[in-house]
């Protein structure tokens, strides 16, 4: 094998073997996956509740075109922060139904962050009632877990929940 001509022949034979391998046809699978899901038909509006911190949100989900009405206002008016808008739409994007449902929500209590988290939970719960087979995807993304974190109460004898006044040894 020390002869350079023999090495060249071996490389050419090996290259021919690898080139002749046929690639699997994946185009059909891509087209099937890219096809939009069939429209959902439900006999009545789905109503769910979501909570986070002090916020409570009641959601009414109906088949539609992806419109949001939050206390009578659009999502852009109610949540001007794009981060909150993405947080709210995340469950719909996860199950690839962002344009399939209209959402009417009544929000009260808490602030923008708590209301956005509560709305996300309520939407995820409503999507499960419509299509139970979406549950594993929503569960693995963490949309069905109620975030139990809340503000810790202030204790007497302390400045805040845990902050004590300065201690002097002498």
Curated annotation (Swiss-Prot):
One of its GO terms (cellular component) is cytoplasm. SUPFAM superfamilies: Ribosomal protein S5 domain 2-like. The keyword DNA repair does not apply. The keyword Ribonucleoprotein applies. It holds the Pfam family Ribosomal_S9. InterPro entries: Ribosomal_Su5_D2-typ_SF, Ribosomal_uS9, Ribosomal_uS9_bac/plastid, Ribosomal_uS9_CS, Ribsml_uS5_D2-typ_fold_subgr. Keywords: Ribonucleoprotein, Ribosomal protein. GO terms for biological process: translation. GO terms for molecular function: RNA binding; structural constituent of ribosome. PANTHER family: RIBOSOMAL PROTEIN S9 (PTHR21569), SMALL RIBOSOMAL SUBUNIT PROTEIN US9M (PTHR21569:SF1). Belongs to the universal ribosomal protein uS9 family. NCBIfam families: PRK00132.1 (NF001099). This is Small ribosomal subunit protein uS9. It comes from Rhodococcus opacus (strain B4).
């Amino acid at each position: 094998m020390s002869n350079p001509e023999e090495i060249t022949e071996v490389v050419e034979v090996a290259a021919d073997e690898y080139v002749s391998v046929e690639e699997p046809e994946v185009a059909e699978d891509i087209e099937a996956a890219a096809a939009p899901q069939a429209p959902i038909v439900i006999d009545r509006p789905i109503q769910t509740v979501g909570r986070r911190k002090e916020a409570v949100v009641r959601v009414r989900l109906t088949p539609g075109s992806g419109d949001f009405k939050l206390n009578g206002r659009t999502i852009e008016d109610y949540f001007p922060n794009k981060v909150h808008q993405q947080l709210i739409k995340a469950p719909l994007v996860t199950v690839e139904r962002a344009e399939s449902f209209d959402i009417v929500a009544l929000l009260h209590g808490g602030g923008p962050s708590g209301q956005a988290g509560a709305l996300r939970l309520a939407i995820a719960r409503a999507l499960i009632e419509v299509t139970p087979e979406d549950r594993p995807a929503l569960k693995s993304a963490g949309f069905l877990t109620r975030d139990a974190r809340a503000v810790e109460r202030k204790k007497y004898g302390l400045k805040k929940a845990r902050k004590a006044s300065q201690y002097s040894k002498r």
